[in-house]
Design a protein with these regions (language model features):
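Intrinsically disordered, low-complexity Pro/Gly/Ser/Thr-rich segments with frequent PxxP/GP/PP motifs
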Residues: 99-135, 569-594
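Membrane-proximal extracellular "stem/stalk" segments
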Residues: 487, 505-626
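Contiguous beta-strand segments within globular domains
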Residues: 40-78, 82, 536-544
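Catalytic alpha-helical scaffold of carbohydrate-active enzymes acting on polysaccharides/glycoconjugates
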Residues: 206-223, 232-299, 312-321, 326
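Cytoplasmic C-terminal tails of single-pass
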Residues: 652-671
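Catalytic grooves of carbohydrate-active enzymes
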Residues: 62-66, 213-217, 291-293, 308-334, ...
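Active-site beta->alpha N-cap acidic-glycine motif
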Residues: 156-250
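Terminal connector regions
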Residues: 131-163, 511, 593-632, 636, ...
Length: 671
């Protein structure tokens, strides 16, 4: 808690530093009567299109200005304010709740400065870091300085605007802390219940902004892309979409992407409803889609980006799936209790998740990005200046640089103002005291890291979809095994089931109903033709069946035959049914007894053995006597043969005697 106390102490000092200070401005070259605050004409505007931000040594800075006020301007004033004391002081000044004192000023006459073809004006002003000289801006100490730029016509201020510069000492070696900009490409589901997908204008525009941002930003960023949106973009028949897809893949080279489920899901609700296995399948599908569509791009599968609050039960399961890092967006940080500020990497409380890191996007910076005003240059500079102020606060409060993770993003992760983020990234890149990196990979934590306490279990559900999703999953896993591995229906059905559990989809029942209709359509393409009865004249034989496949591709099934008075020597093999044809199948059987009895024939899926057709019942006749009956029959046959032999011999004796019964001929010697 020491770090939190130190930050609170800094915040108290901010109240004094940010208090309104009225300092008379003596503008060089004007009369004493002009030393007070000039009149302000509020109708005109002035915007900063480009400016320097980092100042290491004295520099002739150039500010490119635009706006309606420039048409009647004769001078531009630069008012350098007292440097900000800390982040709270910075926000009070940036949000116009406080006006800091002016420590230096410079006036530039613009009547001799050539204007651009677009009416812009590039105004030079010297920022001096060594000494104060006439008509320059002296920034004596390192820190973030507010700078007011105002346009005047004589004594009348036509317009003014606020920006910041960051003065750093090149001789001082600062302690670097990690920082990253997080950007996410997502949007409403692009698939329909009938299996088709369409990229609408909003999704296309979001993708263009995302790609343009990647092409312009030179530093490392943390990225996540919705696999479902990427899938639709890759399959779009529009030539411009194909070009956009290739631009995206080119812009991602050398970067990594955080894996995600195929569409946005609520892991807490799925865990509550007992759908942990479905959550696992959703993530596997999303990861497989990214790997298939982004070959050569590193897919980070160890980080989970949470947009809604998590509980300990869900975090424990995510850890079992291999997630070792959590990124909490502003919506996911609600209800958690922290031992340290959100900028400090932490771990979930409890021993079950001790090696899972927790990082949080900055809530205040997210609010700034969500309501970004002014030009991209001004918004980007403000973001960079606030990040540096936050960094200085953390270091001053004693935070270990290795434990700091500054994550900049909008509230949703979407690129609300990509141009401003580009300016911020460029301003922060190679800034003293900061190290810009991709935070999508694993972040090492130990028990020494502070804890973040999550609720034990949250009561969010999918609203009664549990049974429908479970039943659809069982049917899908079984029936898709009937198709060849490369059949596109396999992927389409998996995608439909994934979309049905997304909280952003209002017509989830239509996706499930459409999926089950497709599954039934495939099973209906298989028909079974059986004889009404069969006759077996020996102990073993075969049952001959015919299967017809009316589908356009080969279909695979198994034949399951059962009877209480028959044995089936072989397990049912997978049978390939050729498209549009009839296949004859012979099932080996072995009779246990003779007589008439029913034989039930079922056609089932290769996996899961889900019934494909209605069962057929065949009457079997077994006429062969087996076992003891065969022994008795042989014995009777032998008796019959013996009787016949005896009868034959008696007949021979009656007709002329049996030669075997006549005495031997010859002389018998006397005894």
């Amino acid at each position: 808690m020491t770090l939190l106390r130190n930050l609170r102490t800094l915040a108290v000092g901010a109240a004094v530093a940010a208090a309104p200070v009225a300092v008379p401005l003596a503008v060089p070259g004007t009369s004493a009567a002009r030393a007070g605050r000039p009149d302000v004409a509020t109708a005109a505007t002035v915007d900063i299109l480009a400016q320097p931000f980092r100042v290491l040594t004295s520099v002739n800075a150039r500010f490119t200005l635009a706006g309606t006020s420039l048409a009647g301007a004769d001078s531009v004033d630069f008012l350098l304010h007292r440097r900000v004391a800390n982040r709270d002081s910075f926000r009070a000044i940036a949000d116009n709740f406080a006006e800091p004192g002016v420590i230096d000023s410079a006036v530039v006459r613009v009547n001799r400065i050539p204007r651009g073809d677009d009416g812009t004006l590039t105004v030079p002003v010297t920022v001096n870091t060594a000494q104060s000289t006439r008509n320059d801006l002296f920034a004596p100490q390192p820190g973030v300085y507010p700078l007011t730029v105002r346009v005047r016509d004589g004594d009348t201020v036509l317009a003014s605007t606020l920006t910041f510069i960051d003065r750093r000492d090149p001789e001082t070696v600062p302690t670097n802390v990690p920082i990253s900009i997080f950007a996410q490409l997502t949007g409403p589901v692009t698939h329909s219940p009938d299996g088709t997908s369409t990229l609408d204008d909003d999704a296309r525009a979001n993708t263009v902004r995302f790609v343009t941002f990647l092409e312009q930003v030179g530093s490392a960023v943390t990225l996540q892309i919705q696999p479902e949106l990427l899938d639709t973009l890759s399959e779009s028949p529009e030539p411009l979409d194909a070009q956009l897809f290739e631009r995206l893949r080119a812009a991602l080279r050398g970067r990594s992407v955080i894996a995600s489920t195929y569409t946005a899901v609520d892991p807490v609700a799925m865990m509550h409803d007992g759908l942990s296995a479905e959550l696992t399948e959703q993530f596997r599908l999303g990861e497989a889609t990214l790997n298939r569509l982004l070959p050569g791009i590193t897919i980070q599968r160890s980080t989970w980006v949470a947009h809604d609050p998590l509980d300990r039960r869900t975090i424990g399961f995510l850890g079992q799936l291999g997630f070792t890092s959590l990124v909490l967006m502003p919506g996911a940080a609600e209800g958690v209790e922290r031992e340290q500020p959100g900028a400090i990497v932490s771990r979930p409380a409890g021993k079950e998740s001790v090696f899972v890191s927790v990082m949080s996007t900055d809530v205040q910076l997210a609010a700034t990005l969500d309501g970004s005003l002014g030009t991209a240059a001004q918004s980007g500079v403000r973001i960079a200046a606030e990040v540096i102020s936050q960094r200085d606060d953390l270091v001053a409060a004693g935070a270990a640089p290795a434990d700091v993770r500054l994550l900049v993003s909008s509230s949703t992760g979407e690129l609300v103002d990509p141009d401003a983020l580009v300016v911020a990234a460029r301003s922060l890149s190679n800034a003293p005291g900061l190290f810009v990196q991709d935070l999508g990979g694993p972040q090492v934590v130990t028990e020494r890291n502070p804890a973040t306490v999550f609720p034990e279990a949250l009561n969010r559900t999918l609203g009664g979809l549990k049974t429908s999703i479970q039943q659809a999953r069982r049917e899908l896993d079984a029936i898709q095994s009937m198709l060849p591995a490369d059949d596109p229906r396999r992927a389409r059905w998996l995608e439909s089931l994934a979309i049905s559990s997304s909280p952003g989809v209002s017509n989830t029942a239509e996706f499930i109903d459409g999926l089950r209709s497709d599954l039934r359509r495939l099973t209906a393409s298989v028909s079974l033709v059986t004889p009404s009865d069969i006759t077996l004249s020996s102990r073993t034989g075969t049952v001959r069946l015919q299967l017809r496949n009316d589908d356009d591709v080969p279909v695979f099934v198994r034949i399951a035959v059962s009877s209480p008075k028959m044995q089936f020597p072989q397990d049912p093999d997978v049978i390939e049914l050729l498209p549009g044809g009839t296949t004859e199948v012979q099932v080996p059987v072995k009779a246990r007894t003779n007589g008439r009895f029913p034989v039930t024939v079922r056609v089932v899926t290769p996996i899961g053995r889900v019934q494909v057709t209605s069962p057929a019942v065949i009457t079997a006749r077994v006429s062969e006597v087996a076992g003891l009956g065969q022994l008795v029959s042989i014995s009777l046959l032998l008796v019959l043969l013996a009787w016949w032999w005896n009868s034959w011999r008696r007949g021979r004796r009656t007709d002329g005697g049996d030669p075997l019964d006549e005495p031997p001929t010859g002389t018998v010697s006397a005894q």
